Design a protein with these regions (language model features):
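Short, low-complexity, disordered segments immediately C-terminal to signal peptides
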Residues: 20-46
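Sec-dependent signal peptide recognition
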Residues: 1-9
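C-terminal motif of bacterial Sec signal peptides marking the signal peptidase cleavage site
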Residues: 14-15
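Short beta-strand elements
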Residues: 431-463
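Propeptide-to-catalytic entry region of secreted or membrane-anchored zinc metalloproteases
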Residues: 50-218, 383, 387-402, 429-433, ...
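Active-site recognition of the HExxH zinc-binding catalytic motif
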Residues: 266-282
């Protein structure tokens, strides 16, 4: 279904106001909200009794103050998504494919089926808990089941465990997995895959891991990530350990001491973190407000997963920005409705300004597939850093906006710091697609410089 939206002439304004001591009190002022400059209309009312003609439609302003909090935004987004899905017949969603890879001369590690059934059930429960807390209900990732248990696609490698496979073996393992799945009639290029590699050795309490451990190119239609298995990896290992088991673990460096709990937090937490990449989530960092909930899963959350079970910290959490992206991913949404259609996004208006110690990004969009939210990743460039994203984005905070009835958004970016920044604007669409536009600015003395931003905005706007 195409959403027909009137084409308006693009408005380009990038400005920097003077720094003020506090944000403006009224967030719905016509002078600050683009939604109030382009009003939507209500259906026609009763006829004029004297002329028999319908009166002029009443103009209604979108009240941004009603979506000022995270729960209010979630309610708005969920409602808009339900409306879109109700307009078309539901198409079955996708399920995460979990693959277990092992070398030719080695069997899978002991109890791998039972252990990974429980690990994935817990990861599924984590997502369910987080989506519920954020106001999206009982939403979680879908897993393939076989006789009531997790379905694992077992793939035997073509090489022996003689050094042929290592951390750098992601691409050759990917090719072997794709060939094996093709024999079962599965097009891996159209799936989201979690590849668990039985590439570790355990000698008592000494563990050596030499598995690929990262995600590769992903979008809402496909994705792939690699994680490691170990005999010591188990959900029970996340709980308080009365035996105080200490492991010696070697992965990239020499052997390092790990408690059993820390080992499982790191590697089960690493599994859900890398799975996030396989689901197309980049890194991000908790805002000051969000940090009250713990550590962002896609930041350093792989090192804090389920710490709350042991009362060692607040644990990991899912940011609202990433919950929005998962909400429409076919592995979560339960539908592939229009998943192969390009959103054909156009930014008709875009304005970046500095008001009340926050960067305000306002704009108006047009798209063939409804846009349910806009997200800004505010990514600071550290000293000596080359480029942004891909392991340089752990400090990127995320900020969200709903889309008004007149297809406008208003993102307010806070927690500002000095230095050079990349501001990535992501449009999230109802079919799971996400479109990225990049802006850059520098911050010095508490004031942003939008000189480069101004040039970039002029290239983004579609008249």
């Amino acid at each position: 279904m195409k959403v027909l939206i009137p084409i308006l002439i693009g408005l380009l304004v990038v400005g920097c106001g003077k720094k003020t001591s506090k944000p403006e009190a009224k967030t719905t002022s016509p002078s600050t909200s683009p939604a109030q400059e382009a009003n939507n209309t209500q259906p026609k009312t009763n006829q004029n009794h004297k002329t028999g003609e319908n009166p002029e439609p009443q103009k209604v302003m979108f009240d941004w103050s009603k979506v000022d909090s995270q729960p209010e935004r979630a309610k708005h987004i969920a409602r808009e998504l339900r409306v879109w899905r109700s307009l078309n017949p539901k198409k079955e969603g996708k399920k995460l494919r979990v693959v277990y890879f092992h070398p030719k001369d080695r069997l899978p590690l002991k109890n791998y089926e039972e252990r990974w059934d429980r690990i994935m059930a817990d990861i599924q429960q984590f997502y369910r808990e987080q989506m519920r807390q954020l106001g999206y209900g009982e939403i979680t990732l879908s897993l393939e089941q076989e006789r009531g248990k997790l379905k694992l696609h077992k793939v035997e490698g073509s090489a022996n465990d003689d050094g042929s496979y290592s951390y750098k073996s992601g691409e050759p393992i990917r090719r072997e997995v794709f060939r094996a799945l093709a024999k079962d009639g599965i097009d891996a290029n159209a799936e989201t895959l979690l590849i668990v590699c039985g590439l570790s050795r355990t000698e008592g309490k000494r563990v050596t891991i030499y598995s690929p451990y990262y995600g590769m190119g992903a979008n809402h239609n496909r994705g792939i990530c690699f994680v490691a298995d170990s005999d010591w990896l188990t959900i029970d290992g996340l709980k308080p350990d009365k035996k105080k088991i200490a492991l010696q673990v070697k992965e990239h460096r020499g052997y390092e001491s790990f408690s059993l709990a820390r080992f499982n937090t790191t590697y089960i937490g690493g599994t859900i973190h890398e799975l996030g990449h396989g689901l197309s989530l980049p890194h991000n960092h908790a805002t000051i407000q969000e940090s009250k909930r713990g550590t962002a899963l896609m930041g350093a959350g792989n090192y804090t997963y389920r710490q709350e079970w042991r009362k060692e910290g607040k644990g990991s959490f899912l940011t609202h920005a990433h919950a929005i992206r998962l909400l429409v991913h076919p592995v979560f949404s339960g539908t592939t409705q229009q998943c192969n259609q390009s959103p054909n996004l156009k930014l008709r208006e875009l304005k970046v300004s500095f008001e009340g110690d926050m960067i305000h990004v306002r704009g108006k969009i047009q798209s063939d597939v409804p846009t349910i939210a806009m997200i800004a990743y505010n990514d600071r460039g550290d000293r000596g850093q080359k480029g942004y994203q891909v392991n340089n984005d752990y400090d990127a905070t995320t900020w969200t906006s709903v889309i008004s009835p007149t297809k406008e958004f208003w993102i307010r970016v806070g927690d500002l710091k000095g230095g050079s920044h990349q501001l990535r604007l992501i449009s999230v669409h109802a079919n799971g697609a996400a479109i990225t536009h990049r802006l850059h600015y520098t911050m010095k003395g508490g004031i942003p410089d939008f000189k480069r931003t101004r040039t970039e905005v002029s290239k983004i706007i579609t008249p």
